């Protein structure tokens, strides 16, 4: 009977060890959960960025205001009859 109890005890210890630290155990499960949370946050940020890009694309396709704004800001274009003034700060002069 003592051998049987000892065998069952050793089996229980081995099963608990395997459950906690073995392959696909609790520790692996927690590590994978943490990776999933990080990846979900990255995906949410990328989804938000994609939505902003789609909105900008739609605005460029449908409205001339967005095209005009980009031409003014990025290319420095002005309309006929307008005068462009560039204000130079103190840091830029030196």
Swiss-Prot record:
It comes from the Bacteria. It is a single-pass type II membrane protein. Belongs to the FtsB family. This is Cell division protein FtsB. NCBIfam families: PRK00888.1. GO terms for biological process: FtsZ-dependent cytokinesis. Part of a complex composed of FtsB, FtsL and FtsQ. Its main location: membrane. It is found in: Cell inner membrane. It comes from Vibrio cholerae serotype O1 (strain ATCC 39315 / El Tor Inaba N16961). Gene3D superfamilies: 1.20.5.400. Keywords: Cell cycle, Cell division, Cell inner membrane, Cell membrane, Coiled coil, Membrane, Transmembrane, Transmembrane helix. InterPro entries: Cell_div_FtsB (IPR023081), FtsL/DivIC (IPR007060). Residues 22-94 are periplasmic. The chain crosses the membrane at residues 4-21. Essential cell division protein. May link together the upstream cell division proteins, which are predominantly cytoplasmic, with the downstream cell division proteins, which are predominantly periplasmic. PANTHER family: CELL DIVISION PROTEIN FTSB. It holds the Pfam family DivIC. Residues 33-76 form a coiled coil. HAMAP family: FtsB. One of its GO terms (cellular component) is plasma membrane. Residues 1-3 are cytoplasmic.
